[in-house]
Amino acid sequence: MKFLAILSLSSSALATISSIQLFAKSDDSKVDGLGLYSKHEGAAIDYLFLGKNGADLKYDDEKKQIFQELKTSSITVRQSFTLGGDVYELGATDNFIPVTINKDGTLSFTGDDKVYASKNVNDPYRYSESEYAVSNKKTDDSAPITIVAKFSDDKAAETSGVAQAASSSAGPAQASVSNFEGAAGQNKLSYGVGMAAVVAGLVM
């Protein structure tokens, strides 16, 4: 039982939350290289559009969850990457789309082979009449895209859940940084000293 508890704690402690931005890769020069950002379209619902810069987002590598934080006076809610109708969005939902970020930065998820930059998607505020929405639907003005993540090298990854509790209660943690090549270089925190102390405490 102690052995299983140690394995479970170790797995949770290695999970990280990284800062990322998303960009479109396409053979169509009109949309290639544009960043994904969100616009309010409803209650805790932000549709994803293409613009000059990508929005600052987070990636939970344990849950495979891309999200941004919506902060109110009393709570903080994760608005997660999901599909609302024909348009990809950031929504306050538990039914988010699990995403794997590959070493080359490309995103793998269910439906990733049919992603388009599309205008005129009939969004509530009609932003798509002048801007490209990220959609799974072709319209009269569409271009196929691949979504690529870029990790923010200047922002250290934040540890989640148990890792924070372990490092704070067991003393200073020893961090090491490893970077992938290209767009997928990401900052990972590896908790050595803190985890060793916690494991020792469990065994004793």
Swiss-Prot record:
Main location per the UniProt record: secreted
Gene inactivation effect: Leads to a significant reduction of cell wall mannan and to decreased virulence with a diminished induction of host pro-inflammatory cytokines.
Maturation propeptide residues: 183-204
Record's keyword terms, sorted: Cell wall, Glycoprotein, GPI-anchor, Lipoprotein, Membrane, Secreted, Signal, Virulence
Record's GO cellular component terms: cell surface; extracellular region; fungal-type cell wall; hyphal cell wall; plasma membrane; side of membrane; yeast-form cell wall
A biological process from GO: fungal-type cell wall organization
Lipid linkage positions (GPI-anchor amidated glycine): G182
Task of the protein: Component of the cell wall involved in virulence. Does not seem to have a major role in maintaining cell wall integrity but plays a role in the relationship between C.albicans and the host.
Record family assignment: Belongs to the SRP1/TIP1 family.
Protein name (record): Cell wall protein RHD3
Organism field: Candida albicans (strain SC5314 / ATCC MYA-2876) (Yeast)
Source taxonomy: Eukaryota, Fungi, Dikarya, Ascomycota, Saccharomycotina
Gene: RHD3
